[in-house]
C-alpha cells in the first residue's frame, strides 16, 4: 500500500489509527508527536494512559477511550539505542511490525505514526528511517510516516544510501565481518552454499582479525568474494 513521508502531525492526516510511542517505563515519549497527542487528548488521554496495562518493548496495544479524533490509538514501547549490543535495530523493526499487525486486526485501512526512536533516542538516523520504510512497504495499510524535524524529513525522502565497506574486520566460524562507513558492520556467511549478508550494530571480539591463533587467515581472494556478496545484496 502507499507510504507517505510527511512533516505533518499524526492527527492532521485523518488516519484510522495513530501511534503513541512510549518510554520503556510506560510513560509517553517526550517527542513532538507524543506532545501533540497528549495535548489533544487532554485529561481523558492522561487518565487512560495511567490505567493502561504495561506494554513490553517491541510490542503494541490499543488504548481505548483515548479522547482523540482518530478511531484507534495504538501504543508501542520503543527501544533506546545504547551500545548496539542489545539488538536495538531488530527490536525497532518489531515495533513497526507490531503496530501494523494490530492495525490490520482492527480493520484499519490507514495509520499515521512518527519515525520511532529517532527524536532523541540516539539511533543511527539512516538505519532507523530505512527500518520504518521497509516495514511500511510490507503492510497493506496506507502508512503516513511523520517526520518530527525538517532534517529528518529531508533524510527520509532521499533514497537509502547503502553503507560502503571500509575494511575487513575478521572472521569467526561461519561468518566474516567488514566495518561499514556508517559505523555498523556487515556480516557475510562464509559457506559457499549460502549466499547471505546482513548488517549488525556490533560484533564480538572473537571476530577480530588475529584474535584466535588457531584460526588461519582468510585468503585475499576469499575476502574479495565475501565483499562482493555484500555489495550485490539487497541491503
Residue ranges of model-derived segments:
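Glycine-/small-residue-enriched capping loops at alpha/beta junctions
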Residues: 1-106
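Mixed-charge, Lys/Arg-enriched low-complexity segments
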Residues: 200-235
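Short hydrophobic-acidic sequence motifs that mark active-site Asp/Glu residues
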Residues: 18, 73, 112, 185-187
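Secondary-structure boundary/capping motif
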Residues: 71, 108-110, 140, 173, ...
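A short acidic, often aromatic-flanked loop/helix-cap motif at beta-alpha or helix-coil junctions
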Residues: 10-15, 151-153, 195
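Phosphate/ribose-phosphate-bearing ligand recognition and processing surfaces
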Residues: 80-163
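Acidic, low-complexity, intrinsically disordered interaction modules
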Residues: 172-175, 179-213
